[in-house]
Amino acid sequence: MNITIEELEKLEPGTFDVIDMRGETEIAHGAIPGSVAIPEQELLENPPENTGKKLIIVCSRGRVSVDVSEELCGRGYEAYSLEGGYIGWLMSEMKKQEAEEICESVEKSIRKKFHKSIWSNFTKAVRQYELVKEGDRVAVCISGGKDSMLMAKLMQLLQRYGDVPFELTFLVMDPGYNEKNRKKIEENAKILNVPITVFETNIFDVANSVDKSPCYLCARMRRGYLYSKAKELGCNKIALGHHFDDVIETTLIGMFYASQLKAMIPKLHSTNFEGMELIRPMYCIHEDAIL
């Protein structure tokens, strides 16, 4: 049986042992923390006592360990070959370090380089419109675009450095993305250290089945699903990534095409989901500051 590096990282400490079969020279140049060095021949001839723990077998590239793990499974052990071996694990660690550096750079840029154009306008909206209060649990709704990803980082920084204690949930609704788009959203969230919760819907299928105003239907359904999921997760607010330009554009469209003056407002109490509120913390940020 095989186990991926991601699956290994999710195992509870104390429920598994990592056994490194590589040679002494290779191990001297680096090993997985906490692993035990046991050469292949010794491992097969005199395996450790079967305590019920999972055995994660590691070789250089995850090839030799496949046969060894299968042999141990045949003897009653719960053994797994680590996919990619030590090289795969090392590459994963390097990617993590790179992601941490990118995330740190993004956070620093928001508070330093873009302090006036982004951070100050963000905190201005939060204070002026009282968007976040003590004890709030805010579902930050992420579509995967630049605006919602920026909002996620801004809300994280507000939680970290602000004076008002509140909780965050980062919510991604999959309305029917293809695999490539879904993966890109997950990868970007991981790089930015945004712990997303993804839930799936069939909105695209429903919207594509109607001829009249599919965009309007899609938007309405999105909002309803987000409210519903956020409430299910114990949130009392959802945050959307609309910025100043969105507000102006929506107002003008309403005037020119619907003959009505109806603007986006920074916060809105839901009429269909009791106790829920929608907030727009990027209300004062201009789009050219984001681009």
Predicted regions and their residues:
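Rhodanese-like catalytic fold shared by cysteine-dependent sulfurtransferases
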Residues: 1-17, 23-54, 60-110
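Short, cationic motifs built from Arg/Lys/His that form the positively charged side of catalytic pockets
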Residues: 22, 64, 222-223, 287
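Short SAM/SAH-binding signature in class I
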Residues: 54-56, 236-237
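Short, flexible loop segments at boundaries between secondary-structure elements
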Residues: 263-287
